[in-house]
């Protein structure tokens, strides 16, 4: 997903 933007928030589910 959007690494660095929402690090850990959504666990990179994209």
UniProtKB/Swiss-Prot annotation:
This is Phosphoribulokinase, 40 kDa subunit. It catalyses: D-ribulose 5-phosphate + ATP = D-ribulose 1,5-bisphosphate + ADP + H(+). Keywords: ATP-binding, Calvin cycle, Kinase, Nucleotide-binding, Transferase. It comes from Selenastrum minutum. Belongs to the phosphoribulokinase family. It comes from the Eukaryota. GO terms for molecular function: ATP binding; phosphoribulokinase activity. Its EC number is 2.7.1.19. Pathway: Carbohydrate biosynthesis; Calvin cycle. Heterodimer of a 40 kDa and a 41 kDa subunit. One of its GO terms (biological process) is reductive pentose-phosphate cycle. It is an enzyme of class 2 (transferase).
């Amino acid at each position: 997903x959007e690494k660095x933007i929402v690090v850990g928030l959504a666990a990179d589910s994209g």
